[in-house]
């Protein structure tokens, strides 16, 4: 799933190219 190189709203892209929820910080 590629959203212009980004992720779904509320998610961030990790260095390995995956997406993680920003609230896991």
From Swiss-Prot:
The record's listing under InterPro entries reads: GBP_PSP
User: Cellular component per GO?
Assistant: extracellular space
Modified positions (Glutamine amide) are 25
Q: Supply the Pfam families for this chain.
A: GBP_PSP
Q: Does the keyword Transcription apply?
A: no
Please report any disulfide bonds recorded for this protein chain, giving both cysteine positions.
Answer: 7-19
> GO molecular function terms here?
cytokine activity
**What keywords tag this UniProt record?**
Amidation, Cytokine, Disulfide bond
Tissue specificity as recorded in UniProt: Hemolymph.
Function statement = Biogenic peptide that prevents, in lepidopteran, the onset of metamorphosis from larva to pupa. This growth-blocking peptide has repressive activity against juvenile hormone esterase.
Q: Which family does it belong to?
A: Belongs to the GBP/PSP1/paralytic peptide family.
Protein's name in the database: Growth-blocking peptide
Organism expressing this protein natively: Cotesia kariyai
